[in-house]
Amino acid sequence: RLVGSEMCIRDRLMRGPVGTSIDLTVRRKNVKKPLEFKIVRKIIEVQSVSSRLIGEEKNLGYIRLKSFNENSDKQFLKSVKEFEKKTTINGYVLDLRNNPGGLLTQAINITDYFLEDGEIVSTKGRKISETRKFFARKGDEVKGKPIVVLINSGSASASEIFAGALKDHKRAIILGENSYGCLLYTSDAAD
């Protein structure tokens, strides 16, 4: 029985093997009869990427990244490949507005797709052994096509790293508002 419990506690108690069920009773204030639900557990894949062709000639790839979750890089790559099959793409608009961030590894993987080489990001811990650097693998997969990244005050964390790395490597123009600013971000890339 959970009454007004924290979301993380409820979440942990409801997790279990796929295909098994959980009985859920919801009691509402000022309503005598509770609501009864039987919920079957399953894997839910969050769709973090949406895309479409834009522009007068439909030759710009618009990709909206809502967050950086476990499958964002695969979803992102699928969108790019579908664009390249349909038409000659002249550039990309990457929309990170209101993207709260997510998994650093996903931001690194997607950033790598647009860089020829070089450092994407480094993380520094209290100890020297906690310092890590992440580098792009050789090869810009979109072959230098222009990129515009849209950000706003809701763009945070991994989305700031993504936008910052593309800007530092002169691979993108950043448009919009200042980002959330939750990172201590400094650039070591050459100007």
Indicate residue ranges for each PLM-predicted region:
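A short, hydrophobic C-terminal helix/tail in secreted or cell-surface proteins
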Residues: 2, 188-191
